[in-house]
Regions:
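Flexible loop/turn segments at secondary-structure boundaries
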Residues: 41-42, 202-204, 262-265
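Amphipathic alpha-helical interaction surfaces in cytosolic regulatory modules
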Residues: 4-88
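ATP-lid-like helix-loop hinge signature
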Residues: 156-206, 273-277
Length: 292
């Protein structure tokens, strides 16, 4: 089976179209995802494609092939070290040593975190990267971003541990991102993107193990944003109340998908604008992306 990723800016906004093909996959069938028409990738899209590939892998038992990758997208995926994902086989184009397309994006290799001691090291490394990328920012900014890493990865590990037959797992990456505004514009300031993904039980099942009040995936996300707790370690629930304060202070954006629902939040000093979306197909686990 071949899945053709269309020429679109945000792959993650249309992942449902690819999920529809999951039911047709047979055991032992090789699934190929064709990137030849893809012109743009961001960490959140890559994370969702990893989770999508995991779902196809679990159905077929065969590694999912990523093929037809344009050279500039291949360069980006190489920096992420996508080849370390064990259920994906990446068919990279030949790369000339001189092909070092310079741009304003800096990204750390994809991190695979499977336990909490490993999370401590990842958080410290995140602080180091942020201090290097944003030397003009205060330590509070770097600490805020590191706290987001700590809270969200803890959620993913907790959700994975509770998922039958699934080992604790969270993929995440951090990218320095330069918006495409004219130099000198007040919007030109570099920003940071942090993206996470797991294939665990998701927010609704996690919340209902303690509260039994989330009737839908959308209501579960809303409850988490209000600060409802569910994490088994007793350390602040899902941490979104704390995370929301960080985003409000930095006028950030938050996108969460869990199962069949997603919310995009834009934080300002005085308000939070939310765009809710219901999906016909359910993506495993929870995927979260931050921009601030």
């Amino acid at each position: 089976m071949e899945i053709q990723l269309k020429n679109q800016k945000y792959i993650d906004s249309n992942v449902d179209r690819y999920l529809k093909q999951l039911s047709a996959v047979k055991s032992g069938e090789r699934v190929t995802i064709d990137f030849s028409q893809v012109e743009y990738l961001r960490p959140g899209a890559v994370i969702q494609l990893i989770v999508l590939s995991k779902m196809f892998f679990e159905k077929s038992g065969e590694k999912v092939v990523w093929s037809g990758i344009p050279k500039d997208r291949a360069f980006y995926l190489r920096r992420l070290q996508i080849e370390q994902v064990e259920f994906i086989s990446v068919m990279m184009p030949p790369m000339l040593w001189a092909y070092t397309r310079r741009d304003n994006e800096t990204v750390i290799p994809l991190e695979k975190i499977t336990n909490r001691p490993q999370l401590g090291c990842a958080t410290a490394q995140a602080m180091d990267h942020l201090r290097e990328w944003f030397p003009e920012e205060s330590d509070d900014f770097c600490r805020d971003a590191a706290n987001i890493v700590m809270e969200i990865v803890n959620n993913s590990l907790d959700h994975s541990e509770r998922c039958e037959g699934n080992s604790p797992l969270c993929y995440y990456t951090i990218q320095k991102y330069q918006p495409h505004y004219p130099i000198g514009s007040k919007c030109y300031k570099p920003r940071v993107i942090i993206a996470f993904g797991d294939a665990g039980i998701g927010m609704r099942e996690s919340l209902n193990r303690r509260w039994n009040i989330a009737q839908t995936d959308m209501s579960a996300i809303e409850l988490a944003l209000k600060g409802y707790s569910c994490r088994s370690d007793g350390e602040g629930g899902m941490g979104f109340r704390r995370v929301s304060e960080v985003l409000k202070k930095n006028k950030g954006h938050l996108t969460i998908r869990s199962g069949g629902a997603s919310i995009h939040c834009v934080y300002d000093e005085d308000e939070v604008r939310r765009n809710r979306r219901y999906h016909k197909e359910r993506l495993l686990g929870t995927q979260t992306a931050f921009l601030f």
